Curated annotation (Swiss-Prot):
It comes from Mus musculus (Mouse). This is Large ribosomal subunit protein mL51. PANTHER family: LARGE RIBOSOMAL SUBUNIT PROTEIN ML51, MITOCHONDRIAL 39S RIBOSOMAL PROTEIN L51. Component of the mitochondrial ribosome large subunit (39S) which comprises a 16S rRNA and about 50 distinct proteins. Interacts with OXA1L. Keywords: Mitochondrion, Ribonucleoprotein, Ribosomal protein, Transit peptide. One of its GO terms (biological process) is translation. One of its GO terms (molecular function) is structural constituent of ribosome. It holds the Pfam family MRP-L51. The gene is Mrpl51.
Amino acid sequence: MAGSVPWAASRRLWGWVPSACRSFSLGVPRLAFVRLTLPPPKVVDRWNEKRALFGVYDNIGILGNFEKHPKELIKGPVWLRGWRGNELQRCVRKKKFVGNRMFIEDLHNLNKRISYLYKHFNRHGKYR
């Protein structure tokens, strides 16, 4: 039949119309998406190292007379302590901090990664 809309498409189109405006029923709603049983509970180790040490330095200011900032207690590379950002920003920051002391091959690989990420962030994503 020319000009007719298939049944499934018409059902989808009527899905946009509120049920109060419809003059007929679309049938019994499907129960395919209704979960009949509860999912099994996840087994979680509540005392792993990360959870056990959570908030351990929260009161460092009170007990330490406010001489140290918690970011000074973080162990890791100097260019990452107390700093947040995406991978491109992290690589640029690493190059700025230790680029002159890196081996040639490592610096070359870092420059390649920065080049790739720069192209990627400019071609993909929400803010391009």
